[in-house]
UniProtKB/Swiss-Prot annotation:
It comes from Saccharomyces cerevisiae (strain ATCC 204508 / S288c). This is Ergosterol biosynthesis protein 29. Keywords: Endoplasmic reticulum, Lipid biosynthesis, Lipid metabolism, Membrane, Steroid biosynthesis, Steroid metabolism, Sterol biosynthesis, Sterol metabolism, Transmembrane, Transmembrane helix. Part of the third module of ergosterol biosynthesis pathway that includes the late steps of the pathway. ERG29 regulates the activity of the iron-containing C4-methylsterol oxidase ERG25. The third module or late pathway involves the ergosterol synthesis itself through consecutive reactions that mainly occur in the endoplasmic reticulum (ER) membrane. Firstly, the squalene synthase ERG9 catalyzes the condensation of 2 farnesyl pyrophosphate moieties to form squalene, which is the precursor of all steroids. It is a single-pass membrane protein. One of its GO terms (biological process) is mitochondrion organization. Present with 2950 molecules/cell in log phase SD medium. Disruption phenotype: Causes lethality under aerobic growth conditions. Affects the methyl sterol oxidase reaction performed by the C4-methylsterol monooxygenase ERG25 and leads to an increase in intermediate sterols and a corresponding decrease in zymosterol and ergosterol production. Impairs Fe-S cluster synthesis via increased degradation of YFH1. Leads to increased mitochondrial oxidants. Leads to an increased accumulation of iron from the culture media. It is found in: Endoplasmic reticulum membrane. GO terms for cellular component: cytoplasm; endoplasmic reticulum; endoplasmic reticulum membrane; nuclear envelope. The chain crosses the membrane at residues 36-56. The gene is ERG29.
């Protein structure tokens, strides 16, 4: 039996099996419709396993990046992280001289999947520190959301908001609180003069590591902060 005859015999058996399946049988009326149905099932199955493979690969690459950042130190070296400085992790645009069309060249798939995901929202529990002591028995809780306007001017906007934006946002949230006004009123304005963005807002990541001012230009996803985390902040007066 030739290879062609073997294939046709196998195809016929598969089509006959499909005719016995619930729902599928209504699409098979003859040999041609059977072939079309069989083709769509085979292609769909291949596409499913391909997507499954890509999803697993993506998860593993992101997990490796997350574990690397979790093990790393919180210092100025993060400004030189390879994903921030290397163009291999980012797409490029150039203009074709002949056609005048702007062409976008994307990064490799493994580089794209390895990048950390930007932080879109988080909760911050904040306490007020006066003379080294916590003033509030129940911390203030702010829900912070970030929009594209917060990071559209960054060199790498796909990594989201920087620590500076979060620090500034919390500073203004607290200054708008009635608690702040009451404290300042009781202290005769002395606390207002001492409370600044640089000296008065201490932010910690989800591992309770202090995030210093010298990394304010680093985006949150590199600082052991993920979307949905609850982190801590201290307002020093």
């Amino acid at each position: 039996m030739s290879l062609k005859d073997r294939y046709l015999n196998l195809e016929l058996k598969l089509i006959n099996k499909l005719q016995e399946l619930p729902y599928v049988h209504q699409f098979i009326h003859d040999r041609i419709s059977g072939r079309i149905t069989l083709f769509l099932i085979v292609v769909g199955t291949l596409a499913f396993f391909n997507e499954l493979y890509i999803t697993i690969e993506m998860s593993l690459l992101q997990k490796n990046t997350s574990e690397e950042l979790e093990r790393g130190r919180i210092d100025e070296s993060l400004k030189l992280h390879r994903m921030l400085v290397s163009d291999e992790y980012h797409g490029k645009e150039y203009k074709d001289e002949k056609s005048g069309i702007v062409i976008e060249e994307f990064e490799d798939r493994d580089k794209f999947f390895a990048k950390p995901v930007f932080v879109s929202e988080l909760d911050v529990e904040c306490n007020v520190i006066v003379d080294g002591k916590e003033l509030l028995s129940t911390p203030l809780k702010f829900h912070v959301e970030f929009s594209p306007e917060d990071y559209e001017n960054e060199k790498r906007p796909e990594f989201g908001t920087t620590l500076r934006v979060l620090r500034l946002r919390l500073y203004h949230y607290f200054k708008d609180c009635e608690i702040y006004r009451d404290i300042i009123k009781n202290e005769g304005g002395e606390g207002a003069r001492k409370f600044t963005i640089s000296n008065g807002v201490k932010i910690y990541n989800h591992k309770d590591e202090l995030l210093p001012l010298n990394i304010d230009d680093v985006q949150l996803c590199f600082l052991k902060i993920d979307t949905g985390n609850t982190i801590k902040c201290e307002f020093i007066l």
